[in-house]
Amino acid sequence: MNRKFDSPRPISNGVNIRSIGIVGYGAFGKLLHTLVGRFAPSAEVRVFSSREKPDGKTFFTLEETAQSDAVVLAVPIHAFEDALKNILPLVCKDTVIIDVATVKVHTTAILKRVAGEQPYIATHPMWGPESYEKRNGDVSGFRIVLAEHSLPNEVYTALAEFLKQCGFDVVEMTPEQHDKHLAETLFLTHFIGQIVAQGGFNRTEIDTVSFGYLMDAVESVKHDGKLFKDVYTFNPYCKEVLERFEISEGKVSKLLEK
């Protein structure tokens, strides 16, 4: 597909992202669409969704979406490898594949094995639609982990600087470091949130401030059952965290019996 662009928008240091493809249009894909329109308004956005018919305005075929300067794979973790394999034969040689999955060891291993010479960057935005809405669109302090990439150093530096200019906090770490931290934070929050939700515990008219904070966390994750299961399945550190939690729970319960 050969499209003409009115005015390429430099992200920074001369790096031009004229078009951004988004594969997957769930809650996070929709948020990405909003953010691109906000922070890169000159860039054309092409969305591929299996649930939407291409209209040439917002939604495009996979082939058209793949011809973007950068393509974000905003798909569930379990669908990441298939999505990558489907799009690789269709992209331009310089198209940057952007991984935004919640786990990084799993997806970076796939990228190394499957992507070949295709440039990619593995990231994890540590926030989602609910956080964005609660903050009324204020992204200051929102963290984005940059875990691994195959980009030229000047391109990587330019992208990182652009994210900082938008207000995000950029955190660099290895996929292993990311997944270890995530197992002890996000996964544990999801685990406790699912337990509280399954138990039918709700807010009351005499809530303490600390209980209110707990319920804020529960309400932010209780509807993400599929993500919760995917993180447990594809993050190699979650089982150990769950074992530690269960041991600690047993110790605390015994203290109450003394």
Where is each model-derived feature located?
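Phosphate-coordination loops involved in phosphoryl transfer and adenosine-cofactor binding
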Residues: 17-19, 94, 141
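A short helix->loop->beta-strand "cap" motif at the edges of active sites that frequently abuts
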Residues: 41-42, 92-95, 116-118
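An accessory alpha-helical subdomain
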Residues: 169-258
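Rossmann-like NAD(P)-binding element
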Residues: 63-91
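NAD(P)+-binding Rossmann beta1-loop-alpha1 motif at the extreme N-terminus of oxidoreductases
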Residues: 2-62
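Rossmann-fold dinucleotide-binding core
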Residues: 103, 107, 111-169
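ADP-ribose/adenylate-binding Rossmann-like module
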Residues: 91-107
